[in-house]
Amino acid sequence: MNKKIIYCDGTFDLFHSGHIQFLKSCKEMGDYLIVGVISDENVLSYKRTPILSLENRVTILQHIDFVDEVVANCSFQPLSKDFLEEKKIDVVVYASEDGQPHWTDHYQEAIKKNIMKFIAYGKDNLSTSKIIEKIKHI
C-alpha cells in the first residue's frame, strides 16, 4: 500500500497550540507528514527575525509524535518540482487566517500539479505575531 505523503512548511516560531492544530490537520490528510522549517535567513525576507533559533524550532517539531520527517533550513524560494518528486509528495498544505491562497509564487509547482491545499487557521486563530503583540502590551 502506498502512503499518502503530506508536506507543509513554515517558520514555527514560539511554537503554540495553533501550530499543533495545523500540523494535526495536515496529518489527517494522509499517512506521512513532512514538515519544512524555513531558515532564519529566508524568514527575514518576508517578516521579522525568529525569536527561536532554527535548531530550537526543528527540535520541537522532531519531538511531535505525528510528524514523521522534519526538513531543516528550507528555502522560501518556490518549492521545486524536483523536491516534490524526490519526496513523493501527494499534498502540499498552507494555512492562513482566511484559508485563501497566499504565497502562490512559492507554491507554483504544487498548484500546477493540482496537489496544493489552502486551509484556514484552527479554531483559536492563534499566531506567533498575535502572541508577540500581546507580550508588547503587558
What do the PLM-derived regions correspond to, one by one?
Residues M1-I138:
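Nucleotidyltransferase catalytic core that binds NTPs
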